[in-house]
Each structure stands twice: as structure tokens, then as C-alpha cells.
Amino acid sequence: MKLNNSLLLLIVAIIASSNAAETFSNFQVTNSEASSPCVTTPVELKVNTCQSACDSILNVLPVTGSTSKFTFNQFGAQDTKCAATPTSSNEFTCVDGKSKVAIGTTTYSVVCVPDKTNSSESDSSDSTRIGASFALFALALLSMLAL
């Protein structure tokens, strides 16, 4: 029974360490309107920044409690500071780094760019996870041998 519990704990720990949440720092947007400058060249939007993109003034705000779910706001052409109430807004979630979101009458394609400043998502994160998984496996093996 103790062996089964140790194996179960090992499996849960490995799964938990490999499923660390990915955070996103900015987005690249395009849309399907032929007249838009975003059709061939994606425009990068930064979180919490008022920017002009795709012939619109846009603002992407994070939703409280989530690092992959955001609110995409569209403002009027004159509102260069995104100070007024958005003309339209919609929430989207980054799934596998890509998403589509409808804002008003326009559908945007959004490519979510991972936040590389997050220490758990650095370029060496895969090797770190492998090392952590190996350490957990060794710890579980030692605890089983001690039984």
C-alpha cells in the first residue's frame, strides 16, 4: 500500500511540475479585412498599453486572476489615450498561443507571445523541468527503498 501511495505521489508531482502556467506579455494581431494594414504584417500589442493597430485604437487588459485570459478593448479613432468607454470589447483566452476574437464587426487573429521575463518560462525551462522530475523520481525511489 505504501508503495502505491509513493508511486501515486510521484506521478502527481511530475504532472504538476510539467504543467506550469504560461504567462503572456504581448500579442500580435491581424484581421481579415482586406483594407487593413494588419492583413500581411502582424502588429504587436502590449498588455495594458493603448495602441493604434489595424486602423483601430486598441487596448489589451489582463483579467484578474488569470495570466492567459484577457480583455481586448477597441476605442474610437479620436481616443488616443483609451480614456473613454471602449466602443466594443471582448474577452479572449490564449490557447496554445493562438486565439481569435471578435471586436465589434472585426475578427482579429491573435498570436499570444509568451512572457520570457517569467523565470519559470525561460529558455531553459524544459531542462529545469526534466531535472526537477528526475529529482522527484529519485526522492520517491529512495523513500520506497526506505520502506
UniProtKB/Swiss-Prot annotation:
Signal peptide (from-to): 1-20
Lipid attachment, kind GPI-like-anchor amidated asparagine: N118
Post-translational modification: The GPI-like-anchor contains a phosphoceramide group, rather than a phosphatidyl group.
Propeptide: 119-147
Keywords for the protein's UniProt record, in alphabetical order: Cell membrane, Glycoprotein, GPI-anchor, Lipoprotein, Membrane, Signal
Membrane topology of the entry: Lipid-anchor; GPI-anchor
Glycosylated sites: N118
Record carries keyword ATP-binding: no
Chief location: membrane
Subcellular location: Cell membrane
GO cellular component: lamellar body; membrane; plasma membrane; side of membrane
Molecular function terms from GO: actin filament binding
Family statement: Belongs to the ponticulin family.
Name this polypeptide is given: Ponticulin-like protein C5
Gene that specifies this protein: ponC5
